[in-house]
């Protein structure tokens, strides 16, 4: 059965047709509407989906935010702008005329990355470090989403009780410090206003403040992974996202993790599917894998 998979992110929308063998075809991308209004997103999704829907039998969505009873919610409402409470499933069912499933994008990516691991791995955690920090947890071969869709939102665990205020309302969340946005917000002096990509470039050039910001992010993620190991006893952790997959970053996380006591050590892998993980994970769920 061919699935029309859609990935809704903060900066881009992606869609593709995916068959039962996880072959991707006719992949398309559009920028996420800057206005972040319901009408703008509805029109963008219609333009994205229209050329593909005739060949599909179902729709699977991986989206930023929390999916609750078909509605789009978020721990950090500022991330969604005017899209809070957007009727995501109903909108796509109307546009495509097909049965529709929706799941958080990091949870979907976790499910895809889990299927790329050896069969003896039954417990794993996926962490994406990008504009924000998200995650997904697979326990005994089952994806955990939680009744309210909150499971795996690891970026909103505590890193520093005296740290910056997070958009979710807590103080010192992992996301507020270790994410691309958090790193950029902490940049000062000649780095003020730089995005995470620029910070990595400057760090590679030896800029001391940039190197500190990257190192601080990696250390915070490593400590979070130690907490995750203690909580889930996972067999491995897979790291993805634009920051997580940046050159040299995973090696720094691994080095900091090795400074933790041995019981908190866990194998770290780079994400295999990269920008297609959300699409593939959502398709897998729609094609018969259950939540």
Curated annotation (Swiss-Prot):
Broad EC category: transferase
* Organism ancestry: Bacteria, Pseudomonadati, Pseudomonadota, Gammaproteobacteria, Enterobacterales
Q: Which Gene3D superfamilies match?
A: 3.30.420.40
Query: Which of UniProt's keywords are assigned here?
Result: ATP-binding, Carbohydrate metabolism, Kinase, Metal-binding, Nucleotide-binding, Transferase, Zinc
Subunit annotation: Homodimer.
From the Swiss-Prot or TrEMBL record, give the protein name: N-acetylmannosamine kinase
Regarding protein family, the annotation reads:
Belongs to the ROK (NagC/XylR) family. NanK subfamily.
Residues holding Zn(2+):
156, 166, 168, 173
Keyword Transcription regulation part of the UniProt annotation: no
Residues at which ATP binds: 5-12, 132-139
| EC number(s) given by UniProt | 2.7.1.60
Q: Looking at the keywords, is Kinase present?
A: yes
Named in its record, the pathway it takes part in is: Amino-sugar metabolism; N-acetylneuraminate degradation; D-fructose 6-phosphate from N-acetylneuraminate: step 2/5
Q: Which organism is it from?
A: Salmonella paratyphi B (strain ATCC BAA-1250 / SPB7)
Reaction catalysed by this enzyme: an N-acyl-D-mannosamine + ATP = an N-acyl-D-mannosamine 6-phosphate + ADP + H(+)
Gene it is expressed from: nanK
Could you give a GO molecular-function term held by this entry? ATP binding
Task: Mention one GO biological process in which this protein takes part, according to its record.
Answer: N-acetylneuraminate catabolic process
């Amino acid at each position: 059965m061919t699935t029309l998979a859609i990935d809704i992110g903060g900066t881009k929308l992606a869609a593709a047709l995916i068959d039962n063998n996880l072959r991707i075809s006719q992949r398309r991308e559009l920028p996420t509407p800057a206005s972040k209004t319901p009408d703008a997103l509805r029109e963008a999704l219609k333009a994205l989906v229209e050329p593909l829907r005739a060949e599909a039998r179902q729709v699977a969505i991986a989206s930023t935010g929390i999916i609750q009873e078909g509605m789009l919610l978020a721990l950090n409402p500022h991330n969604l702008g005017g899209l809070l409470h957007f009727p995501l499933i109903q909108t796509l069912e109307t546009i495509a005329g097909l049965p529709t499933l929706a799941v958080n994008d990091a949870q979907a990516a976790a499910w895809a990355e889990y299927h790329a691991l050896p069969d003896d791995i039954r417990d794993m955690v996926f962490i994406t470090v990008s504009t924000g920090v998200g995650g997904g947890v697979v326990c005994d071969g089952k994806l955990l989403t939680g009744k309210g869709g909150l499971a795996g939102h690891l970026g909103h665990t505590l890193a520093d009780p005296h740290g910056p205020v997070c958009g979710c309302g807590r103080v010192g969340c992992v996301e507020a410090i270790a994410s691309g946005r958090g790193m950029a917000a902490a940049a000062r002096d000649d780095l003020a206003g730089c995005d995470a990509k620029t910070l990595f470039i400057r760090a590679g050039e030896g800029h001391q403040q940039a190197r500190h910001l990257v190192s601080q992010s990696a250390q915070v993620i490593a400590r979070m992974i130690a907490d995750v190991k203690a909580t889930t006893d996972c067999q491995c952790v897979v790291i993805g996202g634009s920051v997580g997959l940046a050159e040299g970053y995973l090696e720094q996380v691994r080095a900091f993790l090795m400074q933790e006591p041995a019981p908190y050590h866990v194998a770290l892998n780079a994400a295999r599917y990269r920008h297609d993980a959300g699409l593939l994970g959502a398709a897998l769920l729609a094609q018969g894998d259950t939540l």
